[in-house]
Amino acid sequence: MSSINERPQDPSSALEQATQDVANLKSEFHHIMDEMQVADKTLVSSREQYLREDYVLHKLVKQHGSLTKDPKEGSITETVEKEMKRCGDLQQQKCILANTALYLVTKHLSKIKANIESLEEDGLLAPLDDELSDKKAGSVDLGAGIAGLGNGTAGSGSSSGRKRPASSSSANGKGQKRKQQKKERSRSHQRAGTVSRDVSPNAGIGRDPTFDALAYNDDLFKMNQGGEEDDKQLYCFCQRVSYGEMVACDGPNCKYEWFHYSCVNLTEPPKGQWYCPECRLEIANQKLNKKKKKQ
């Protein structure tokens, strides 16, 4: 593999060097994602553990009152604090892994940009802006082409965006309406996040296929980035943006509403109604209160 500071002799050697540098990137990403998945599963287990202990603690307080200290209260409190600290440590571990993946991409991208700049300085590669300016005179307006892609006139929106499994039917109310609005917003992100690669021959784009790729590269990247920046809503226990498979809680008053599969230990869409751990705990408390009132 070439040295990091070595200047490429020509464009082909720069391409070969970049290909060699990123050869192991996929396997490195797989390893990082596997580590994050393990941390996610452990975190979910710890969270369920301290929620169960917290429920037991509340039950003891209700039975004996807050002034009378139960012998089990100390050990339960210690367990809750221990599991909560463990959850915090796991979240920190996941942040470090995510930053590692970001660093790997940034490092390779910076090196590719530096090689391109050095080739331009040596006169071995024509500056991209100059090449596009020369070809613009004999082609259609790029702005109109990009607008056509953005409006869906040159290609249809891809359906490979974020997948949001439909929640099973539940009682009508504010919770259901709120989840439906989130589903519609998710679908709009899917349509805006990716555009089709199939461009109609009659779309009025320049004849040179190389020019086509260069002309739309930066604008499409900015457009796609814009679609992702719109969805800054935080979901789930982990309070992160939406990604991958997500499931909606059927609890009408759920404060999170959407959950990542890995955070709730799911691998496939649940059958029937599904409630998050906190809503399940709330439902259990409601049933317990009803029984006490009947007694």
Curated annotation (Swiss-Prot):
Cellular-component GO terms for this entry: NuA4 histone acetyltransferase complex; nucleus
Query: Where are the PHD-type-classified zinc fingers?
Result: 233-282
Which residues of the sequence carry a binding annotation for Zn(2+) 1?
A: C236, C238, H260, C263
Gene3D superfamilies associated with the record: 6.10.140.1740, Zinc/RING finger domain, C3HC4 (zinc finger)
Q: Report any Pfam family annotated for this entry.
A: ING
Disordered as annotated region, ranges: 151-208
The Low complexity compositionally biased stretches are: 156-171
- Gene Ontology biological process terms, A to Z: chromatin organization; DNA repair; meiotic cell cycle; regulation of DNA-templated transcription
Listed Basic residues bias regions: 175-190
Site annotation (Histone H3K4me3 binding): which residues? Y235, M246, D250, W258
CDD domains the record matches: ING_ING3_Yng2p, PHD_ING
Question: Keyword DNA repair on this protein?
Answer: yes
Function recorded in the entry: Component of the NuA4 histone acetyltransferase complex which is involved in transcriptional activation of selected genes principally by acetylation of nucleosomal histone H4 and H2A. The NuA4 complex is also involved in DNA repair. Involved in cell cycle progression and meiosis.
Quote the subunit structure annotation: Interacts with H3K4me3 and to a lesser extent with H3K4me2. Component of the NuA4 histone acetyltransferase complex.
Domain characteristics, as noted in the entry: The PHD-type zinc finger mediates the binding to H3K4me3.
Q: What family does the Swiss-Prot or TrEMBL record give for this protein?
A: Belongs to the ING family.
State what protein this is by name.
Chromatin modification-related protein YNG2
Please state the gene responsible for encoding this protein.
YNG2
